[in-house]
Curated annotation (Swiss-Prot):
Molecular function as annotated in GO: transcription coactivator activity
Gene it is expressed from: med31
Name listed for the protein in its UniProt record: Putative mediator of RNA polymerase II transcription subunit 31
Subunit-level organization: Component of the Mediator complex.
Organism of this sequence: Dictyostelium discoideum (Social amoeba)
Alphabetical list of InterPro entries matching this protein: Med31_sf, Mediator_Med31
């Protein structure tokens, strides 16, 4: 390799990185990495930042699981909703409805279910498989039809607006 490259082969046949971090490959015992630089950039500046990120990810995953009626049925049948601490946790998770957090949610119906889980009656109904099946069916129909209908409704509204604009342009201004 040329000497202008940051990676060079030394006299022993090992590959060296001329930057601050030295990476050495040994043929005998695999790869070994020798770090000479203490200024390596870590993804987190401190343990608290890493803990906050992990909490964010875990809460996001849990919130999104709430969009699954079968998972809600599992929680109900395993008596999670009878635990006051768990119910309080669901109340705490309401902050995910704020726009700065909601933008990370892929399944927005999870926020709707989070609202419903604040109701004792809804939590009780989730114990019954018929209720869970009904919720699942309604969710499926919403995905199947509402999205498509919503797009056709938007297209119709757009066409009406365009027609109104064209009519306004064609009509000459009236003078008194």
């Amino acid at each position: 390799m040329s000497s202008s490259s940051p990676i060079n082969e030394n006299d022993n046949g090992n590959i060296e990185n001329n930057n601050e971090t030295n990476i050495t490959e040994n043929g005998d015992n695999g790869e070994s990495i020798d770090k000479k630089d203490d200024n390596i950039v870590l993804p987190y500046e401190n343990d608290e930042e890493e803990a906050n990120y992990l909490r964010f990810i875990m809460e996001l995953e849990f919130i999104q699981c709430l969009s699954n009626p079968r998972y809600l049925n599992y929680l109900a049948q395993n008596r999670y909703f009878q635990d006051k601490a768990f119910v309080n946790y669901l109340v705490y998770l309401q902050y995910w409805k704020k726009p700065e957090y909601a933008k990370f949610i892929v399944y927005p119906q999870s926020l709707y279910f989070l609202d419903l889980l604040q109701e004792e009656r809804f939590r009780q109904e989730l114990n019954h498989s018929q209720s869970t099946d009904f919720i699942h069916e309604q969710q499926f129909y919403h995905w199947q039809y509402y999205r498509n209908n919503r797009m056709s409704i938007k297209e119709q509204e757009l066409q009406q607006q365009q027609q109104q604009q064209q009519q306004q342009q064609v009509q000459p201004p009236t003078t008194v």
